[in-house]
Structures are given as C-alpha cells and as structure tokens.
Amino acid sequence: MKKIILTIGCPGSGKSTWAREFIAKNPGFYNINRDDYRQSIMAHEERDEYKYTKKKEGIVTGMQFDTAKSILYGGDSVKGVIISDTNLNPERRLAWETFAKEYGWKVEHKVFDVPWTELVKRNSKRGTKAVPIDVLRSMYKSMREYLGLPVYNGTPGKPKAVIFDVDGTLAKMNGRGPYDLEKCDTDVINPMVVELSKMYALMGYQIVVVSGRESGTKEDPTKYYRMTRKWVEDIAGVPLVMQCQREQGDTRKDDVVKEEIFWKHIAPHFDVKLAIDDRTQVVEMWRRIGVECWQVASGDF
C-alpha cells in the first residue's frame, strides 16, 4: 500500500532534513512541501517574503493534493509521498486522512519532538526561514496538544491565584551568589514587585510563591525553605498562601522543576491567572503551557 507520510513538528525540528535523507535512501518516495509552493507561486527569492492570505493558502493546498495524487498514481515504482510541513493543524491532518482513505492509501506520522530551548536556538540560526517567537510558541503549544501533554486552560471553581518567583523577582541578591543560600535572608526586596503582590492580594487573588532555590541541605532538607518563607513573610511582607520550592538534591533546570511543581501542586488547587518571573527559560515555560507571564527584567541566563 502506498504511503502518505506526514511530518509532525515545529519549525526547525528537523523535518526537511529528515525528508531529504529518507528520500535519498528510499527511492520511490517524493517530498511535497507547502513552503516550496508558497515561494514558487509568488516568485519570491526568499520564503519570508510570502504574505499569508486565505486565497493563496487555498491555492497552495490545492496544489499539494493535486501533486500528491499525480505522484501516487505514477505507477508501481512510486512508494509514497512525504508532506514535510509542520502538520500541527488537526484539520489539515484530517484532510490528508480523508484523502488517503478515498484512494486506498495509508497515512503515517513521523513525529519530531524537540525541546523548546533547542527550537529557540535553532530558530535564531535559520536566517530568512526563522519564524517570530510568538508564532513558534503557538506552534509549540499545538505540538504539546498533539502529544497529549497538558496545556493549562485554567481551573474553574478554584480560587484565582498569581504566582511569584523569588530570586530576581520578589528579591534582589545583596552581596551573595545565586547558590549561596546561607545568606538568602540578607536579600533586599524588589519594591514594585512586592507591592504588586500585595495589590493582587487585596483584589482577592491568592499569592503563590514558587522558587527554584534548593529547599535545604542534606543535613537539614528544609533549611532554605524555612529561611525563604521567613524572608517572604517577615521582610517582604508578601501575603502568600502557598510556597513551593525545589527539593533538596534536585539539580534539574529551573523550567523543568517549576513546571512539575505547577502541575502537581498548584494547577489542581488554584485557578492561576498570571505568573511573575524574571528568568527567560522559565518565562517561556509559563507561556508555552498556557499561563500568562510578565517578565520582571531581562533574564536570559
């Protein structure tokens, strides 16, 4: 049975590279790509010159299906076609499924699951093929949905809440390094962020503090948790209702730790409306899982 292979993945995830290599090793397969048609029908030199319209996209879709049909009817030497697009739109995948069913062909998915940080790095090096970061973020969200990973759409019926980070957000380090937690009680407040937390509390929001700080030492696994809580409540005066922190000995990246904390301890109990953070990797994590996030300062570290 002849195949229609749909690549599934964000821009920069390696779909086109894989298609080229696959076709080189598997005679009888052919590649059909929307971007190629977009560039061709408008006679553009570069792909980023293309301006999306419903009419032009309809033409591209028609060309894709007509080409696929012509190729697949091309005799026994033809084994299949690769549709090397993102294919993150469920309606487009359904259209190919329907098309294949009508003619008795088989649809397969080739999935390219690339971490967000790697996608951003690759996107920055793609030149005219790069997509705006908000577009990449939207596509990554669609990829999560395709993979069955959770995307946050609120928790109706639970208390509304705002999440605040500590280091670089509520607190500014005062003569210590980020891992010198023995001195974390000497931090100074970040006044406008602390005021914001109090304003939201007065408006009826629950304040949840989430920190990437390790919670303690081997000898005292909650030492830094207690020091942090005391600073947040007594020094900053933040009216928090919950504090979550990295477990002692957990060396994973901040965005991984905080996302896990969110799904396990926060999402089931609060209707989270906003997160306030400073570190870019964490800010992007909040946004890509569906939580609005305000970034306090430039934090690309």
From Swiss-Prot:
EC number: 2.7.1.78, 3.1.3.34
The protein's role, per its UniProt record: Acts as a 5'-hydroxyl kinase, a 3'-phosphatase and a 2',3'-cyclic phosphodiesterase. Catalyzes the transfer of the terminal phosphate of ATP to the 5'-hydroxyl termini of ribo- and deoxyribonucleotides. In the presence of ADP the enzyme also catalyzes an exchange reaction. In the exchange reaction, an excess ADP causes the enzyme to transfer the 5' terminal phosphate from phosphorylated DNA to ADP. Involved in countering a host defense mechanism which activates T4-induced anticodon nuclease and shuts off viral translation.
Catalysed transformations (reactions): a 5'-end dephospho-2'-deoxyribonucleoside-DNA + ATP = a 5'-end 5'-phospho-2'-deoxyribonucleoside-DNA + ADP + H(+); a 2'-deoxyribonucleoside 3'-phosphate + H2O = a 2'-deoxyribonucleoside + phosphate
Co-factor(s): Mg(2+)
Protein name, entry field: Polynucleotide kinase
Alphabetized UniProt keyword annotations: ATP-binding, DNA damage, DNA repair, Evasion of bacteria-mediated translation shutoff by virus, Host-virus interaction, Hydrolase, Kinase, Nucleotide-binding, Transferase
pH dependence: Optimum pH is 6.
GO biological processes: DNA repair
Native organism taxonomy: Viruses, Duplodnaviria, Heunggongvirae, Uroviricota, Caudoviricetes
GO molecular function, one term: ATP-dependent polydeoxyribonucleotide 5'-hydroxyl-kinase activity
Disulphide-bridged cysteine pairs: none
Gene3D superfamilies in the cross-refs: HAD superfamily/HAD-like, P-loop containing nucleotide triphosphate hydrolases
InterPro entries linked: HAD-like_sf, HAD_PNKP, HAD_sf, P-loop_NTPase, PNKP_C_HAD
Organism of derivation: Enterobacteria phage T4
Assembly description: Homotetramer.
